[in-house]
Amino acid sequence: MKFLSLLLLVGVAQAIVPPREPRPPTGGGKKLLTYKECVPRATLAPRSTSLAWINSDEDGQYISQSDDGALILQNIVTNTNKTLVAADKVPKGFYDYWIKPDLTAVLWATNYTKQYRHSYFANYFILDIEKGSLTPLAEDQSGDIQYAQWNPVDNSIAYVRGNDLYVWNSGKTKRITENGGPDTFNGVPDWVYEEEIFGDRFALWFSPDGEYLAYLRFNETGVPTYTVPYYKNKQKIAPAYPRELEIRYPKVSAKNPTVQFHLLNLASSEETSIPVTAFPEDDLIIGEVAWLSSGHDSVAFRAFNRVQDTEKIVNVKVGSKESKVIRERDGTDGWIDNLLSMSYIGKVNGKEYYVDISDASGWAHLYLYPVDGGKEIALTKGEWEVTAILKVDTKSKLIYFTSTKFHSTTRHVYSVSYDTKVMTPLVNDREAAYYSASFSAKGGYYILSYQGPNVPYQELYSVKDKKKPIKTITSNDALIEKLKDYKLPKITFFEIKLPSGESLNVMQRLPPNFNPFKKYPVLFTPYGGPGAQEVSQAWKALDFKAYITSDPELEYVTWTVDNRGTGFKGRKFRSTVTKRLGFLEPQDQVFAAKEILKNRWADKDHVGMWGWSYGGFLTAKTMETDSGVFTFGMSTAPVSDFRLYDSMYTERYMKTVELNADGYSETAVHKTDGFKNLKGHYLIQHGTGDDNVHFQNSAVLSNTLMNGGVTPDRLTTQWFTDSDHGVRYDNDSTFQYKQLTKMVYDQKQPRPQTTPLHQWSKRVLAALFGEEAEE
């Protein structure tokens, strides 16, 4: 909501003309992409518009922000707009805002300070729209409030400060908990729950009628601490002693934070702890909380065992505070993903249901489940997957969702009636494309976002007329005009079949002036992690990968291959990597490399790989195979040993060390012959301030390679002082991409037939090549 455009509902409804062709753009001009246009971020990029739909009595209202900063209330039905908050009432430098449901107040976040990937600290202020007065949420706040949220019904706000829960109501604040501190979190997740379970910064949920609040309490007592040093700490002159950030970070088989489920009666402030007996305390993860009623009768939570291959849905009856398991599943053939997809439906044929996504059939599909337990009702089926629930419209008895029905690399928007089970596409689902949609509060309108493979656009529709848009929200016509001057890399998508029968999705970029009679170096660019997807029909940024394909001095062909274990091709395809990360994935990349080398234009002497995070790990494991196919590699922020990574991610796929000791030993990068035998070079890059994949991984990897005899002409390790997992501190990203570019340039050059001998290298060369060493 931080970057909103003013949308004026004027003029005649217009669709995108001409329609986008179902392929990535190639340009049509003569200009080639330059380094400055692509690195470190793409400057030739599509824009998108975010809308804040308003949940009011009248559907089709949303908030946008004008050029002068004012908040504008737009009404699709009446084709009007009005100023809700004048520009001079908007706090300077605000980070985010939330409109009170009755449109009488705005909650502003200011003085933003980033914490982890999703979380931040801020000051919060309440603007009374009618009076124009601005009131601090807490009088003594000092940029230390962790989270705040409006009650969906009344004038109250739940917020978290110092890991304690508070409720503000019409100017009066009540402290709900008093045990918050460094090891106890109320209503907000700790690091590992934020990063690996919720993917968000809150752990509290108002009931639909606003009368109750469900929240989680996390206790990190006994969870080991990892210390991240900050050598510069954003100071001009480095402090003599680095600042040390201590994070409770559970690694594999270490103690996890414990979690408790609580209910708060907002009228009486009565707080109740609900016993969780689904799993023992030290074997419990709560992955999702959802209200299963239109009021506050029932609330459910999704419980997993520690290694996330067993799931139990627990329903709590708020009145009696009694709970029972209403659904459970054994997923020990792999793991069970936490899709955060439970949503209350209401009564169907006299029985209350909720909708959820499950891949128990082997493919992720929509099911209705009885709130009180019982047999599910399948709403979708087939060898394709539902990827997200977009909206539940209980009035029309429709569920809107995205799926891979056309192909695993595509996304199309559909509705399914939970009354008739009839499935209807909202878009042309017979061509390769990638769509999503954002629905108004009551489901009468939606913004359809075409996200690729061609230049993205957004259109506004009524659900009553899915063929003709009300208007185009974002056309990106200016970008299309600019791209007409360019000759862009040619992107194609295809599949290659493994000897075992599975097919792998591949995305190929060819240089703009590709000549099949020339030789071209090749760079593989995988991510390859469990359940992930890189090869999709979504828009491909004109970034570093596009640049190295375009530059006449480089002209790399790039291949991105989604190996076994990646997502959206069914449970069996995903689960095959269980307990053996880094085993099948490099085999698939090597197989793909052998396939590309069947092309006469592929230069077998210059085949590299670059990956980030899991992709960096996969790059290292692929070099480790000593296949003779890859000649160089580049790993950015790699995991090198999953015993060094967090428990909730790793154990989902690898289980615990006690259950899989040999698997962990094999998963770690530990063999060095493949690195020693590279014709080219191996580069490691890592930020020392990485709180996710710790710098420890690259430190250990470098040590392993050096002790294993990898020579300086084969290995470079580059650290980035205080940079996090995204390498964003100071000018680090600029240096990083210059280094990567120099690497791919150097690695495509002809290699000398003989290596010069020096006093410092004779013994090493003798060991490598069997030559007699001189004393």
UniProtKB/Swiss-Prot annotation:
- Name the reaction it catalyses: Release of an N-terminal dipeptide, Xaa-Yaa-|-Zaa-, from a polypeptide, preferentially when Yaa is Pro, provided Zaa is neither Pro nor hydroxyproline
Renumbered to this chain, the signal peptide range is 1-15
Q: Quote the catalytic residue positions.
A: 613 (charge relay system), 690 (charge relay system), 725 (charge relay system)
Q: Name one GO cellular component term.
A: extracellular region
EC supergroup of this enzyme:
hydrolase
Q: Which GO terms describe its biological process?
A: proteolysis
According to its UniProt entry, the function of this protein is described as: Extracellular dipeptidyl-peptidase which removes N-terminal dipeptides sequentially from polypeptides having unsubstituted N-termini provided that the penultimate residue is proline. Contributes to pathogenicity.
Could you tell me what this protein is called?
Dipeptidyl peptidase 4
Originating organism? Arthroderma otae (strain ATCC MYA-4605 / CBS 113480) (Microsporum canis)
